[in-house]
């Protein structure tokens, strides 16, 4: 689950991490009150959306007067934000963040991440802050440092010394850096985060380390342990089908292809996506209905996949160990019989009650093609998608 910037800053503030004053407003009138409260006549106004690239895509405005701040608030609240991280969709802007300008001497990148390569949490740092970390890694690899962490949420003194030396933090700045890193690591572990990113972290001309921007992602599977974080979920920032899938308890991720997939089991679902790609096709979604889905859940799953206007072909790939193939068939038929425009459908059923499942579909008269092979089913689905 992604947090908005202001929510991330709220979380970091609870760990006594230094952040410039900030306020959230949802109208120009609220902005006028905040300006008086903060006592500022210049500042930065930033859209609050679950996407990066805000500065490059008009989502951040530096204002040098009170009137410019108010104009920026009005402008940003009217926009729908889009960047290369929004998958072609535009996100609503319901709130903007106001914060004063600071006198920046140096900018840095600092994050606590899940290091997939080494299978452990890690601290990632760079002396080139304010840039996309992917760009830093590509252009300035010598300016990037990754420090692995232990499962016990400890960071050792020798690692802290390594970091301070790499970042060229001396004297009091080094002491601030040590305390900041310790607090960030603790925050990461305490809240089951999968990402805690500060970009930029700045050293001001007054020699104070400050967090100017923050991004936090919480592990969805751990939210039951964090009810105070769970309520921060903002469905307006998610794909509508992702939101619906969460409500009905399905594992769904929207993708960019045109072949809708309904599969049971995460491993089989990922294999299905891979084999479609091998045959030259592209999936419109990842959808794992699990091993014990009911007929009603299958109906909801089929409807969910077909609600995507990009779906040209439906590929159902079920290996029924616990799953009852007849329930899958009945759910599919129930949805298809209510639709006027049917799309080509490829069905691969194997396992419990497979013959009954095939009979249910065949009796219904809905147009679909059966296959007993995953490879053949994927090839057929791709071929049909290219004919549409």
Swiss-Prot record:
This is Succinate--CoA ligase [ADP-forming] subunit beta. One of its GO terms (molecular function) is succinate-CoA ligase (ADP-forming) activity. Binds 1 Mg(2+) ion per subunit. Gene3D superfamilies: ATP-grasp fold, A domain, ATP-grasp fold, B domain, Succinyl-CoA synthetase domains. The lineage of its organism: Bacteria, Pseudomonadati, Chlamydiota, Chlamydiia, Chlamydiales. It catalyses: succinate + ATP + CoA = succinyl-CoA + ADP + phosphate; GTP + succinate + CoA = succinyl-CoA + GDP + phosphate. The keyword DNA damage does not apply. SUPFAM superfamilies: Glutathione synthetase ATP-binding domain-like (SSF56059), Succinyl-CoA synthetase domains (SSF52210). PANTHER family: SUCCINATE--COA LIGASE [GDP-FORMING] SUBUNIT BETA, MITOCHONDRIAL (PTHR11815:SF10), SUCCINYL-COA SYNTHETASE BETA CHAIN (PTHR11815). Succinyl-CoA synthetase functions in the citric acid cycle (TCA), coupling the hydrolysis of succinyl-CoA to the synthesis of either ATP or GTP and thus represents the only step of substrate-level phosphorylation in the TCA. The beta subunit provides nucleotide specificity of the enzyme and binds the substrate succinate, while the binding sites for coenzyme A and phosphate are found in the alpha subunit. Keywords: ATP-binding, Ligase, Magnesium, Metal-binding, Nucleotide-binding, Tricarboxylic acid cycle.
């Amino acid at each position: 689950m992604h947090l908005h910037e202001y929510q991330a800053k709220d979380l970091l503030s609870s760990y006594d991490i230094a952040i410039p004053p900030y306020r959230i407003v949802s109208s120009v009138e609220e902005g006028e009150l905040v300006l008086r409260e903060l006592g500022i006549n210049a500042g930065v106004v930033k859209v609050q959306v679950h996407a990066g690239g805000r500065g490059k895509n008009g989502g951040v405005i530096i204002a040098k007067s009170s009137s410019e701040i108010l104009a920026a608030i009005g402008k940003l609240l009217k926009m729908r934000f889009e960047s290369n991280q929004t998958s072609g969709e535009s996100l609503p802007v319901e709130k903007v963040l106001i914060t004063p300008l600071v006198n920046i001497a140096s900018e840095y990148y600092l994050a606590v991440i899940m290091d997939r390569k080494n299978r452990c949490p890690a601290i990632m740092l760079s002396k080139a802050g304010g840039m996309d970390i992917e760009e830093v890694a590509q252009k300035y690899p010598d300016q990037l440092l990754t420090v692995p962490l232990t499962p016990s949420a400890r960071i050792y003194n020798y690692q802290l010394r390594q970091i301070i030396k790499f970042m060229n933090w001396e004297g009091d700045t080094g002491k601030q850096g040590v305390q900041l890193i310790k607090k960030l690591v603790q925050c990461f572990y305490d809240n089951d985060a999968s990402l805690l990113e500060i970009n930029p972290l700045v050293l001001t001309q007054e020699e104070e380390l400050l967090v100017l921007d923050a991004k936090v992602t919480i592990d969805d599977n751990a939210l039951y342990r964090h009810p105070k974080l769970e309520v921060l979920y903002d469905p307006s920032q998610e794909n509508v089908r992702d939101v619906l899938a969460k409500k009905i308890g399905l594992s769904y991720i929207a993708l960019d292809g045109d072949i809708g997939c309904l599969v049971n089991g995460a491993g089989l679902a990922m294999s299905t996506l891979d084999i479609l790609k091998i045959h030259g096709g592209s999936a419109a979604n990842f959808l794992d209905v699990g091993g014990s889905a009911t007929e009603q859940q299958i109906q909801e799953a089929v409807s969910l996949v077909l609600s995507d206007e990009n779906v040209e072909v439906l590929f159902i790939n079920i290996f029924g160990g616990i799953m009852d193939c007849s329930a899958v068939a009945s759910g599919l038929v129930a949805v298809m019989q209510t639709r006027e425009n049917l799309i080509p459908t490829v069905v691969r059923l194997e396992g419990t009650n497979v013959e009954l499942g095939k009979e249910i579909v065949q009796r219904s008269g809905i147009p679909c093609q059966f296959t007993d092979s995953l490879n053949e089913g994927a090839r057929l689905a791709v071929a049909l998608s290219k004919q549409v």
